[in-house]
């Protein structure tokens, strides 16, 4: 968690908690990316997060999920990959994506007048052939100054 007003920084993932949801056939019907987001919403709710927004857009920026927990606003980027995919979800969060997330985060916190802590989290979802998903959730991949 980075308090408002500090300079953003990239953080390498340390320990990654995992979750597996077997029998997720209802997710498969909507496509891999949307299924990964739906699975992530369910996972977040089951872990005490309150979902505030889904697919929130500002200009040409988008945040997959905005949620709160324990007084912290979480901007969750969801990356869904087939099990064993060559590019990792963490590698997909390049400089351009980090900049876009930062702009969207700042815009959202200005609009909502959110004055508490914010953080960007990564939900790396692996889609298995049997219809199950594996969640690798990395909190705080990037700090953020949401104020201006």
Give, region by region, the residue ranges found by the protein language model.
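Domain-level recognition of nuclease-like catalytic cores that cleave nucleotide substrates
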Residues: 1, 5, 111-148
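Acidic-basic catalytic patches of nuclease active cores, encompassing PD-(D/E)XK
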Residues: 2-54
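Conserved catalytic cores of phosphodiester-cleaving nucleases, focusing on short active-site segments
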Residues: 44, 63-86, 95, 101
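Hydrophobic residues on conserved beta-strands that form the core of alpha/beta folds
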Residues: 51-53, 75, 120
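Short, glycine/acidic-enriched loop or turn micro-motifs at the edges of active sites
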Residues: 56-58, 80
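Short acidic/glycine-enriched loop/turn segments that link adjacent beta-strands
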Residues: 58-61, 131
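Structural motif
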Residues: 60, 73-75, 117, 135
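Mid-chain, well-packed structural core segment of small domains
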Residues: 86-116
């Amino acid at each position: 968690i980075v308090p408002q007003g500090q300079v953003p920084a990239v953080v390498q993932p340390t320990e990654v908690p995992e979750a597996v949801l077997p029998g997720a056939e209802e997710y498969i019907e909507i496509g891999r990316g949307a299924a990964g987001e739906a699975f992530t919403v369910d996972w977040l709710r089951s872990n005490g997060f309150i979902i505030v927004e889904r697919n929130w857009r500002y200009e040409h920026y988008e945040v997959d999920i905005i949620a709160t927990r324990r007084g912290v606003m979480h901007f969750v980027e969801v990356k869904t990959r087939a099990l064993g995919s060559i590019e990792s979800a963490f590698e997909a969060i390049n400089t351009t994506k980090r900049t876009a997330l930062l702009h969207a985060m700042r815009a959202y916190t200005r609009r909502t007048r959110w004055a508490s802590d914010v953080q960007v989290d990564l939900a790396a979802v692996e889609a298995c052939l049997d219809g199950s998903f594996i969640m690798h959730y990395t909190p705080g991949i990037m700090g953020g100054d949401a104020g201006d």
